[in-house]
From Swiss-Prot:
Protein family according to the UniProt entry: Belongs to the rotavirus NSP4 family.
Keyword Glycoprotein: yes
PTM: The N-glycosyl content is primarily Man(9)GlcNAc, with a small amount of Man(8)GlcNAc.
Organism expressing this protein natively: Rotavirus A (isolate RVA/Human/Sweden/1076/1983/G2P2A[6])
Protein name: Non-structural glycoprotein 4
Main location: host cell
Pfam families, sorted: Rota_NSP4
Subcellular location: Host rough endoplasmic reticulum membrane; Host membrane, Host caveola; Secreted
Glycosylated residues (UniProt): 8, 18
Superkingdom of this protein's organism: Viruses
GO biological process: monoatomic ion transmembrane transport; symbiont-mediated activation of host autophagy; viral process
All ranges on the Cytoplasmic side of the membrane: 52-175
Length: 175
């Protein structure tokens, strides 16, 4: 029975649209007929599509206000796109989501900057310690015997036979 009621309602709306269009067509100066016909078709389609959708959404949803708001915004955005506008209507929730996303990204960037700054400070401190260790300090006279590892080398007076044992000897070989 509901289907017949919807069918009668649809036929009545179509009849109303046809009579409106015939009234408009009687005016010979009407140049905007295709635009008006398109708008009326879109409005009728939106009307027929949105009412059952809204009924189902309101019955199944716990937060009906958000559903109505979302459907209304979607319908207006569709109409704006059909009219050729690039702008869209945004709800407060979408703006808050975008702001939360921006704030989250800023926090992530700040944490990264803090980590990088901490690393750079640690590197600078390490370089300072390395520089301090590499600084040349004058100690006055340096004992070169220890530097060239000659601690156990004996002087000429300390040799037993008085001659240098490291001097080359004359060697004769038998043939």
């Amino acid at each position: 029975m509901d289907k017949f009621t919807d069918l009668n309602y649809t036929l009545n709306v179509i009849t109303l649209m046809n009579s409106t269009l015939h009234t408009i067509l009687e005016d010979p100066g009407m140049a905007y007929f295709p635009y008006i016909a398109s708008v009326l078709t879109v409005l009728f389609t939106l009307h027929k599509a949105s009412i059952p959708t809204m009924k189902i959404a309101l019955k199944t949803s716990k937060c009906s206000y958000k559903v109505v708001k979302y459907c209304t915004v979607t319908i207006f955005n569709t109409l704006l796109k059909l009219a050729g506008y690039k702008e869209q209507i945004t709800t407060k929730d979408e703006i808050e989501k975008q702001m939360d996303r921006v704030v989250k990204e800023m926090r992530r960037q700040l944490e990264m900057i803090d980590r990088l700054t901490t690393r750079e400070i640690e590197q600078v401190e390490l370089l300072k310690r390395i520089h301090d260790k590499l600084m040349v300090q004058s100690t006055g006279e340096i004992d070169m015997r220890k530097e060239i590892n000659q601690k156990n080398v004996k002087t000429l007076e300390e040799w037993e036979s008085g001659r240098n044992p490291y001097e080359p000897k004359e060697v004769t070989a038998a043939m």
